[in-house]
């Protein structure tokens, strides 16, 4: 597929390259959040469902009316963070054996909640402030792609230059040794899954901004 795509003369067209950058932003945000979980030797299987659920929360607010686009975005990110925090607490406080179990269950719960909050209907006509992140460009480059690059830079600095970033690596390397060295591994893990939820929410916002719709059934 890669060879045939590159061989196509239209592959290098400006519109196609910009389209690819816009489409990859969704997965890029999910991957940024997932990175933290993977470093701690865990995984978050609920990121896709979390993104859809956060988008559907925005859809429910848009359908109800009376909410600004900025408020929708803030609530969306708060909901994503809350879901991620619950994932972290299930792992650290209830001491479930592996995040595979808790996040897999959370994924199914979120799919159901996405259908409930939208009443299984597609929602459209979002404010321009919401669609700006997914559709607009700055000097020809998609806003969502620029935000992804900035997020990558910030994440690199955070993981390599801060004590919390190093604690995340230590937790993934040897959880018990890290705990015995005085690092609160429970808080570190909860932070990682909370950030995964925030990144999932950003992915949901970008998805709504690019398509202009949200659909709990998809």
Language-model region placement:
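Inter-helical junctions in multi-pass inner-membrane proteins, predominant
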Residues: 7-19, 158-160, 165, 193-218
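Hydrophobic alpha-helical transmembrane segments
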Residues: 20, 27-28, 49-53, 70-78, ...
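Hydrophobic positions within alpha-helical transmembrane segments of bacterial inner-membrane proteins
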Residues: 32, 36, 49, 73, ...
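Alpha-helical transmembrane segments within multi-pass membrane transporters and channels
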Residues: 66-107
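Transmembrane helix-bundle core of multi-pass membrane transporters
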Residues: 99-162, 188-191, 207-218
């Amino acid at each position: 597929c890669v060879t045939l795509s590159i061989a196509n003369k239209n592959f290098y067209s400006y519109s196609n390259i910009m389209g690819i950058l816009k489409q990859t932003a969704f997965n890029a945000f999910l991957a940024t959040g997932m990175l933290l979980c993977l470093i701690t030797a865990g995984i978050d299987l609920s990121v896709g469902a979390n993104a859809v659920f956060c988008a559907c929360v925005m859809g429910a607010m848009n359908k109800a009316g009376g909410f600004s686009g900025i408020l929708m975005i803030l609530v969306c990110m708060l909901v994503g963070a809350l879901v991620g925090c619950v994932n972290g607490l299930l792992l650290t406080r209830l001491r479930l054996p592996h995040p595979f179990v808790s996040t897999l269950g959370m994924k199914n719960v979120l799919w159901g909640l996405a259908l409930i909050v939208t009443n299984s209907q597609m929602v459209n006509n979002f404010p321009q402030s919401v669609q700006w992140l997914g559709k607009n460009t700055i000097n020809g480059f998609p806003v969502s792609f620029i935000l992804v690059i900035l997020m990558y830079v910030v994440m690199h600095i955070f993981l390599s230059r801060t004590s919390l970033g190093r604690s995340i690596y230590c937790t993934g390397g040897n959880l018990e040794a890290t705990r015995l060295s005085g690092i609160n591994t429970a808080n570190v893990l909860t932070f990682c899954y909370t950030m995964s939820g925030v990144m999932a929410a950003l992915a949901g916002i970008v998805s709504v901004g690019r398509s202009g719709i949200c659909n709990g059934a998809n």
